[in-house]
């Protein structure tokens, strides 16, 4: 059993690293309006994972605080990334406008950790990540299908999602067994759903339950 640390790709305005990262151009840029890209326990701006300097800067922080202490696996949440307002024309990555190249973000986010871990001498690198794109498999991405509902409808959709991942050449894929939102443990229907989902999970590349 090993500890896996969850890391999100955004930084709060109140962080000790925020001003430095902003001045160095390591954050996703907002073309208009207030520079708040996600509201979650405060005002947040996303790291620009498409910027090689960002990947290096963040990994150095991760190495110092986690990898050097023995952490070998990371849970890369919010990898889409999850903007509070999906007005893609308002955001720009170092690699280009989000409207044009936005889908590469999760791949570059996985790359940020993979390349750092590899440089650190780690082998057999696998990190759990909430989103992926073509080429993510190159960077040790173990993708899960995100925060889904505890319903038979969402359960059925996982079959399609898993097939799509396989067709994209991404071998490591899983789901939140039983779903993420809305399950009531005392409900017999949910109990049946959980059993069926565990049966499905047995045949997935990775068997995993979340909360």
Description of each model-found segment:
Residues 1-211:
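Catalytic-domain carbohydrate-binding cleft regions of carbohydrate-active enzymes
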């Amino acid at each position: 059993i090993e500890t896996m640390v969850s890391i999100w790709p955004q930084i709060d305005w109140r962080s000790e690293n925020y001003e430095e990262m902003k001045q160095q151009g390591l954050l996703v840029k907002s073309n208009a309006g207030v520079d708040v890209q996600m509201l979650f326990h405060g005002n947040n701006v996303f790291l620009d994972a498409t910027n090689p300097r960002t990947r290096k800067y963040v990994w150095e922080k991760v190495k110092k605080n986690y990898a050097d202490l023995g952490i070998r696996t990371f849970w890369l949440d919010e990898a889409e990334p999850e903007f509070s307002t999906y007005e893609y024309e308002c955001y720009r990555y170092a690699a280009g406008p989000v409207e044009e190249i936005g889908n590469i973000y999760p791949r570059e986010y996985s790359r940020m950790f993979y390349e750092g871990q590899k440089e650190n001498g780690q082998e057999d690198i696998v990190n759990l990540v909430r989103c992926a794109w073509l080429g993510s498999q190159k960077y040790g991405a173990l993708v899960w299908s995100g925060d889904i509902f505890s319903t038979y409808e969402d359960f059925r959709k996982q079959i399609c999602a898993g097939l799509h991942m396989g067709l994209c050449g991404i071998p490591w894929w899983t789901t939140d067994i039983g779903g993420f939102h809305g399950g009531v443990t005392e409900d017999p229907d949910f109990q049946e759903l959980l059993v069926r989902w565990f049966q499905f999970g047995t045949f997935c590349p990775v068997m995993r339950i979340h909360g």
